[in-house]
Amino acid sequence: AFVFFQSLTLLLASLLILLPFKSVYAADIALIIDDIGYKSDDINAFTLPSEVTFSILPHTPYSLSFSQLAEQQQREVMMHVPMEALSGKTLGPGALTSNMLPNAIKASLAAAHKSVPNAIAINNHMGSKLTQLTLPMTATMEYLHEKGLYFVDSRTTRYSRAESIADKLGVPNLHRHVFLDHIPEPKHIAMQFKRLRRVANKYGQAVGIAHTH
């Protein structure tokens, strides 16, 4: 896994060099690396250009130290908040679920924020169930509005209501266009990068998400 992650990091870095954040079409591309915080090997991601945003899982062994290291690199950091999935998969610490009251959701987000104190935004880890539900997403957006944070919808379901609720409550938001590494093979990742570039050239901006491996 360690050797593969190094290869993935080098691939991502080389592709970023070939794919400027402002292309000749003035298209903006944002790249987010999810799932950071559980493994010491995640530190290898810090060799990526500082324009790459890290989304750190809260309450993990390295959430605070990696958050601080990212700040030293002037790298943007997000909280990768576990949210309930339709599959019922185990979510991990700091998870938001459909049976939580609004105050409990806000308290959970506040506690998670302490472990990633310089987060400027959150995105959902899983969340195919929760992002469809009005009440928990309203509580989430109310917290973000209060703290001046924004939301990136990982779009784990096409039925997500997160963006519409964020818009209603005045929370700046974006959504994921392309998952780069759902098939973690270099050829597939390169193909997905090309897809990301096409989306950016067509719409003027695109958000890609990749993961540590």
Where do the language-model regions lie?
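N-terminal secretory signal peptides that target proteins for export/translocation
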Residues: 1-4
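Bacterial N-terminal signal peptides
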Residues: 6-20
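Catalytic-site microenvironment of enzymes
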Residues: 25-213
